[in-house]
Amino acid sequence: MIRGGREQSMLNRAADYFHDFHCLAGACPHTCCAGWEVVLDEETALRYFQVPGALGEKLRSVIQADAEGDFCFPLRGGRCPFLNEENLCEIHLQLGEAATSVTCRSHPRFIEDYGAFREITLSAACPAANELLLGSREKLTFSSWEDEERSEPADPWLEGLTALRTRMLSILTDRKAPLRRRLTDFLLLAWQAQALLDEEQGEALGDLARTWGPQALECGAGPGLFPWALRVLGELEVLEADWRTLLRRGEETAPARGDEALLERVACYFAFRHLLKAVNDGDLLGRAQLCVLAVLTVERLTPVCGGLGEALRRFCREIEHSEENLEALLEAFCQREELSLVCFFRELCLS
């Protein structure tokens, strides 16, 4: 991007704890090299075909093409074939980090490039990142820095959407109100913003962000989200077999109110990562519903998972790391009555 006759460097944004992250490597209790099949970018795969010696022979014997035609490392016993007995990567040890695939180098980072800026989220499915997120009860803030990469022109209404997200984050962190009231206002603002997007008035999002104020809401009688939302989650693609068991136990266990300060940080984590992705398809409300569903589900699963951190880790691993599951939920918010917006409002108002 060129401003004032000068090329603009890339602006990066991330949570305030981003630079404190350190991989636990072999000490990680839930290694990212198990349970997920590693898909290789083409450049890395071609480089692996040229590696000499015993490691090169193993690489060439292991690499296969998956159903989509992508190169991958099929799991062996649920583990990457290059994960050794100390839970360390043989490729990293022998060739260095730069020789690992893009997927392996970037994990646990979710990286979203919006042209004018880039945003990076440390996945809460990673134990080290999870601990950083939940290791403070302070309001979650976000830092920024520039690098030498050049930015590109942004979508015309990304600026308004970014301002709207800032307003939505400020709602979530307004501790003068109970968390459920904040989540209600968060959804109400998303609902009104969605009406503008549906009318192709994205340029008005900034004005809405500046002028919006809390509104009264009549919930009415009827069902809330639970236990039906847990059953919908159980219909999705599953990574670990006991996930559905945990969801069923969540149905049977009396819900308990969680720590609002920590759940607020969870809400901000999801809002930061997901809301701006509406620039790609216009579905802001669905992503706001995803954020609220995540908070309420994690809170509900905390007793059966043995703690908030583990409940969040499992939700992120099963849902947030599956594009198929995320897309299925966005579709369900539009089509499934048990996940309708009114059910969200009833759950928040009556629970």
Language model segments and positions:
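Short, charged low-complexity linear segments at domain edges
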Residues: 1-16, 53-89, 97-106
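Long, low-complexity, compositionally biased intrinsically disordered regions
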Residues: 2-30, 115, 128-130, 143, ...
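Polybasic, low-complexity association/targeting segments
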Residues: 17-68
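Active-site-adjacent structural elements in folded domains
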Residues: 18, 75, 152, 282
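Local cysteine-cluster metal-coordination motifs and their immediate loop/turn environment
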Residues: 20-38, 74-110, 123-131
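Short, charged/polar micro-motifs that form catalytic or ligand-binding hotspots
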Residues: 23, 94, 154, 158, ...
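Internal, well-ordered alpha/beta segment that forms a basic, Gly-enriched binding/recognition surface
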Residues: 87, 95-185
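Hydrophobic, aromatic-lined core segments that form the binding pocket/scaffold
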Residues: 173-351
